[in-house]
Each structure stands twice: as structure tokens, then as C-alpha cells.
Amino acid sequence: MDINEAVDQFYKALNDIIAGDIEPMKEIWSHADDVTYLDPSGAFLVGWDDVLASWQKQANLNIGGDVHPENLHVIEVDNLAVTHNFEIGTSHLRGGNEPVNIRVTNVFRKEDGRWKIISHHTDLMDILE
């Protein structure tokens, strides 16, 4: 899998989270102790267990809606890759179609020949604070 396929896999997994399914997100993330997640509620999480708990909380909300990356910029060097982009879409958390438009940075590391996310940093989203 190349880095662009990994990005696609992450956004599929993110849309699955929005629909309440956490399983694909578990596949794209590294389960290492050094992973980090600066989540949309403002939390700064370190380690797979804490990162997983945040994603599970979001999946349990079963928000509905969809997001996709725009203006994707990829930097790839050896076994690390960094992506910067906007996440654009809609959220149905409050019963309507609230726009989503945030900035995102992802860091991927190649583990056993596959790209895995080791860091995800988003802008704050008041719907998840």
C-alpha cells in the first residue's frame, strides 16, 4: 500500500467512525505506546489505549454525516510520511447538517511494510468538546 492508499483507508475509517463502526480505524492505526492524538475535543492523548478510547467515544456518538480530505499535501521520507489537509463535510450530531471544515495533520509510519497512523492532530470542533 502506498501513502495515498493509506490516506484513503484513513478517511474510509473516519467515515465509518462517524457511522458508529470503530473496527476499520483499529486497522489503520499503529497500536504502539508512542502514538498521539490531539482530538477535536481538545484532548492530547498518548498511547494506543488512550487513542482507542477517544475513537470509541466518537463511534458511540454515531454522529452521521461524512468527511473527505481536500488540498492534501504529502511529505514522504523513508518510513515516515506527514499529510496536511482540510477535512470537509457534514455532521448530523445535532440533528441537522452542520458543516465540517477543519485543518488536519497526520503522521504515518511504515510498520511491517504497511503505513500506519502514529499521530492525528485536528482543529477543535465544538460539537465534540
Label each region the model flagged.
Residues 1-24, 30, 34-129:
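A beta-strand edge to alpha-helix "cap/lid" segment located at domain peripheries
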